[in-house]
Amino acid sequence: MGVHDEARELTDEGRQYLAEAADAFSNWLLREGLPAVGCLRFSPLTRTRQTADILSRHLAPTDMEVAAGLRPGSSSREAGDLVSLALEQQAPSHLVLVSHHPLVANVIALWSDSEDLAPLLPGGCATLEVISPVRGGAKLLRHQPDPRKVLV
């Protein structure tokens, strides 16, 4: 019998791709003159906790926290409320969210008002400049649907 989704861990291959993608992302932030990651919010499930641990080693956020609003079944509105609250409380210049499908795809499509983006594979990521977490309230800066194809 398979491992329940909440307890499923990242594979060794997934950990490797994630570490490479995090390094590439960190380098991209520097090249683009974008702010360093200030806050990291992640779903309480095992693999997102593991992802957050790997990201924290590479991105060095000053604030990390589990966010129930990022667990499977959460709505885009819950994610938006989470972003609004984090921005009010911490005023981070850069917030990273680690969550699951379909929430990730829904939030990216909604906030960027773009329904035609390639879907993210596990470990894929997108970077948005969020003015407001509502439809069309963000500009897509970077889209990396496949973590095995590291963007430079």
What residue ranges belong to the model's regions?
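Domain-level recognition of soluble alpha/beta enzyme cores
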Residues: 112-151
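Generic beta-sheet signal
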Residues: 38, 91-99, 103
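Conserved beta-strand termini and adjacent loop/short-helix elements that scaffold enzyme active sites
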Residues: 67-69, 143-144
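Active-site-proximal alpha-helix that buttresses catalytic centers in soluble enzyme cores
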Residues: 1-68, 74, 117-118, 123
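Active-site catalytic microenvironments for nucleophilic, acid-base chemistry
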Residues: 24, 54-58, 85, 110-114, ...
